C-alpha cells in the first residue's frame, strides 16, 4: 500500500481523535472538510435508529465571505449587497461521493488490525459524511461504525443512505419482495425478518370546518409491528402503539378555551406584579369594574334585607363555544362563593390598578361595616376570605389597600378560584386524588410560584381535554396518563413543546387512522443478531429525511396540477448496511 495513503489515513484518524478529546464542535480538515462532533443529528437519528453515542459528521467546509476593503464613499447598494451575502446561511453542504468514500476508507483502514502500518486511536466515534447524491444511487449519506468481539475490533458496518424526490405513484415504490431480495443478495442469507413502522397525525382525521384554524397542537400515533406483508399496509391491531401528544393552550376549538381566557388574565396580573409592567386585556364586560362590584354588593345587601326579586347568583358559568370541534368538557362549577363571583366580575372588566384598588376598597368597607356577610368556602385561603371569616366574629384585622396590595389580593382570589375548578374536575372525575395534587395546591410557597404550578395544572387539563373529548380514551388510560403528567411537572419547567407519550391499544384509535394515509411509513428487513445484525430499510415520508440536498418532485407537471388532491406524495429513503469482518 502506498505510503501516501497510509500517511493520509493516519493523519485523518489522529485529527478525529484530537477533536474528540478536546470536544471541539467544529474543526476544519485540509481546508475543504468541516468535521462536526455532534451528540445527535435528528434526521439521521430518525432513519438509523437508537444510537446513544456522539458521532462525527463530515461536510464541505463553507467559505467565509470577507468583504473587500472599500472606500468610505462606497455606494449604499454595495454595502447592502455585502450585508446580504454575510447574512445568507446556505445550511450544511455535501461533499462529493469520491471524497466521502476516501474519508470512509481512511477511517476503515486505520481500524483494520491486519494493517500493521496503520493504527487507529481507541474508542473513536462513528463517522458520517454528507454526500451530494451525484452517483446513480443518489447517495445522500455514507457512514461507518466499528464492531467489536469482546474488547477487540472485529470489523465495521458501512451504511449507505439513498434518497429520491416525492411521488404519488405507488408503482414507483420499491416492492417488499424487491427489498427482501436486495437484503438477501447483499448479505447472502435466506432467513430474514420484517418490521413495520407508521405514523399518523390524528388531528388530520377531523373534517370539521374549525380545522381551518392553524393549531400548534398535535396528536401523533406511532405504531410498530412485525411480519410486514406489503408496502404501506395499515398497521394490524396487534401493533404496539404510542400516542405522542403536544398541546398548545389557547386553541379556540378547545373545550377549555374559556378557562384559557381566565388563565390569561391571571398570568397577565401575575406578570405585572412581578415585572412592574402589565398589558391589560380587552374587557369583556361593558360595565366598569367599579359598577359591577357595587352591583354585587347591592345584590347581597338586598338579599340580606329580604328585598323581593333578588337572589344570589350561584355561578358565573362560561360555556365552551357550541361549535367547538371537540365535545364539551365542563370545568366551571355551579357553587361559586362571593370571592369567586367577585373574581369573575373583576377579571372581565378591570383595566388598571386603580380599578382593582377601588373595587377592593368597596368590598372591604362593606365587610367592615357589616353590610354584607357573604358565604365563602371554608377552605378559602385568600386575604379577603380570611377577612370575611373574621367579620362573622366581629373581629376584623386592618387590611392595607395601598400600592400593589389590592392587586395581590385579586391574584389570591384568582388562584383560589381556579384551583378549586381544577380540583373539582380532576378529583370529581376520579383522575387523581388530593394527595397527588398536594404539590400543585401548596399555598405556603409565594404567589408567583403558586401561579407557575396552577399554570402547569392548566396545561395538564388541556392535554386531558384532547385525550378525553377528541380521542374519547377510556377512564383507565386517562387515570394512568394523568399520574404520569402530574409526576413530570413536579420536576420539570412549564413547556408547551414537550411531547407527552401514552402507550395505548391500537383498537382504541384505529377509527382515526384506518382510512387515513400515514405521513411516515417504513419497513425494515433484518438478519443476524447482536453486533452481526444487519438491516435494509425503506422510508416513505411526507418530508425529506435529508437537509443538505435538493430533491426534485418525481411527477409530471400535469399530474401535480390536475391530480387527486387527496393523494399523498412520499419522499423515498433507502438505508442499506454492509458488514465487513476483519477477523
From Swiss-Prot:
Keyword Transmembrane in record: no
Subunit record text: Component of the RZZ complex composed of kntc1/rod, zw10 and zwilch.
Protein name listed in UniProt: Protein zwilch homolog
Alphabetically ordered keywords of this record: Cell cycle, Cell division, Centromere, Chromosome, Kinetochore, Mitosis
Family that this chain belongs to: Belongs to the ZWILCH family.
Function: Essential component of the mitotic checkpoint, which prevents cells from prematurely exiting mitosis. Required for the assembly of the dynein-dynactin and mad1-mad2 complexes onto kinetochores.
Species for this entry: Danio rerio (Zebrafish)
Gene: zwilch
Coiled coil regions, renumbered to chain: none
Keyword Ribosomal protein: no
Domain of life of the organism encoding this protein: Eukaryota
Biological process, per Gene Ontology: cell division; mitotic spindle assembly checkpoint signaling; protein localization to kinetochore
Main localization category: nucleus
Compartment(s): Chromosome, Centromere, Kinetochore
Gene Ontology, cellular component aspect: RZZ complex
Entry-linked Gene3D superfamilies: 1.10.287.1880, 1.20.58.730, 2.20.25.230, 6.10.140.520, 6.20.270.10
InterPro entries per record: Zwilch
Amino acid at each position: 500500500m502506498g505510503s501516501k495513503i497510509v500517511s493520509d489515513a493516519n493523519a485523518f484518524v489522529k485529527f478525529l481523535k484530537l477533536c474528540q478529546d478536546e470536544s471541539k464542535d467544529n474543526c476544519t480538515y485540509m481546508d475543504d472538510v468541516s468535521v462536526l462532533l455532534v451528540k445527535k443529528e435528528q434526521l439521521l437519528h430518525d432513519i438509523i435508529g437508537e444510537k446513544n453515542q456522539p458521532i462525527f459528521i463530515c461536510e464541505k467546509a463553507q467559505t467565509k465571505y470577507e468583504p473587500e476593503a472599500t472606500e468610505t464613499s462606497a455606494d449604499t447598494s454595495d454595502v447592502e449587497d455585502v450585508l446580504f451575502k454575510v447574512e445568507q446561511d446556505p445550511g450544511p453542504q455535501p461533499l462529493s461521493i469520491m471524497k466521502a468514500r476516501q474519508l470512509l476508507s481512511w477511517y476503515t483502514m486505520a481500524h483494520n488490525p491486519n494493517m500493521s502500518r496503520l493504527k487507529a486511536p481507541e474508542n473513536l466515534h462513528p463517522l458520517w459524511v454528507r454526500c451530494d447524491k451525484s452517483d446513480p444511487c443518489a447517495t445522500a449519506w455514507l457512514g461507518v461504525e466499528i464492531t467489536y468481539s469482546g474488547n477487540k475490533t472485529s470489523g465495521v458496518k458501512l451504511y449507505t443512505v439513498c434518497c429520491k424526490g416525492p411521488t404519488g405513484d405507488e408503482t414507483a415504490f420499491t416492492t417488499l419482495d424487491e427489498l427482501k431480495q436486495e437484503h438477501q443478495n447483499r448479505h447472502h442469507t435466506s432467513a430474514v425478518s420484517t418490521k413495520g413502522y407508521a405514523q399518523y397525525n390524528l388531528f388530520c382525521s377531523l373534517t370539521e370546518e374549525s380545522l381551518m384554524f392553524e393549531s400548534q397542537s398535535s396528536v401523533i400515533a406511532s405504531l410498530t409491528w412485525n411480519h410486514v406483508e406489503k408496502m404501506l399496509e395499515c398497521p394490524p391491531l396487534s401493533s404496539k402503539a404510542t400516542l405522542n401528544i403536544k398541546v398548545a393552550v389557547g386553541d379556540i376549538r378547545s373545550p377549555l378555551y374559556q378557562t384559557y381566557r381566565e388563565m390569561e388574565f391571571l398570568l397577565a396580573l401575575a406578570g405585572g406584579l412581578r415585572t412592574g409592567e402589565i398589558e391589560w386585556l380587552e374587557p369583556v364586560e361593558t360595565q366598569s369594574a367599579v359598577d359591577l362590584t357595587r352591583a354585587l354588593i347591592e345584590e347581597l345587601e338586598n338579599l340580606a334585607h329580604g328585598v323581593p326579586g333578588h337572589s344570589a347568583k350561584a355561578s358565573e358559568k362560561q360555556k365552551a363555544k357550541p361549535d367547538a370541534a371537540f365535545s364539551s368538557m365542563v370545568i366551571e362549577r355551579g357553587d361559586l362563593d362571593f370571592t369567586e363571583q367577585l373574581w369573575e366580575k373583576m377579571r372581565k372588566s378591570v383595566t388598571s390598578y386603580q380599578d382593582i384598588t377601588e373595587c377592593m376598597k368597596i368590598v372591604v368597607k362593606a365587610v367592615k361595616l357589616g353590610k354584607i356577610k357573604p358565604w365563602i368556602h371554608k377552605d378559602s385561603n385568600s386575604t379577603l376570605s380570611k377577612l370575611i371569616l373574621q367579620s362573622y366574629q366581629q373581629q376584623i384585622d386592618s387590611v392595607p389597600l395601598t400600592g400593589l396590595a389590592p392587586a395581590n389580593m385579586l391574584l389570591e382570589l384568582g388562584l383560589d378560584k381556579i384551583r378549586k375548578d381544577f380540583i373539582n374536575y380532576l378529583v370529581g372525575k376520579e383522575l387523581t386524588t388530593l394527595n397527588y395534587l398536594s404539590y400543585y395546591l401548596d399555598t405556603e410557597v409565594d404567589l408567583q410560584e403558586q401561579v407557575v404550578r396552577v399554570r402547569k395544572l392548566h396545561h395538564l387539563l388541556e392535554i386531558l381535554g384532547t385525550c378525553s373529548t377528541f380521542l374519547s380514551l377510556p377512564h383507565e388510560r386517562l387515570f394512568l396518563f394523568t399520574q404520569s403528567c402530574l409526576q413530570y411537572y413536579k420536576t420539570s419547567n412549564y413547556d408547551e413543546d414537550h411531547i407527552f407519550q401514552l402507550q395505548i391499544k391500537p383498537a382504541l384509535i384505529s377509527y382515526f387512522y384506518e382510512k387515513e394515509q400515514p405521513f411516515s411509513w417504513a419497513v425494515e428487513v433484518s438478519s443476524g443478531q447482536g453486533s452481526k445484525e444487519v438491516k435494509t430499510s425503506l422510508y416513505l415520508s411526507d418530508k425529506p429525511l435529508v437537509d443538505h440536498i435538493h430533491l426534485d418532485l418525481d411527477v409530471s407537471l400535469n399530474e401535480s396540477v390536475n391530480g387527486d388532491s387527496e393523494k399523498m406524495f412520499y419522499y423515498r429513503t433507502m438505508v442499506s448496511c454492509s458488514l465487513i469482518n476483519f477477523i
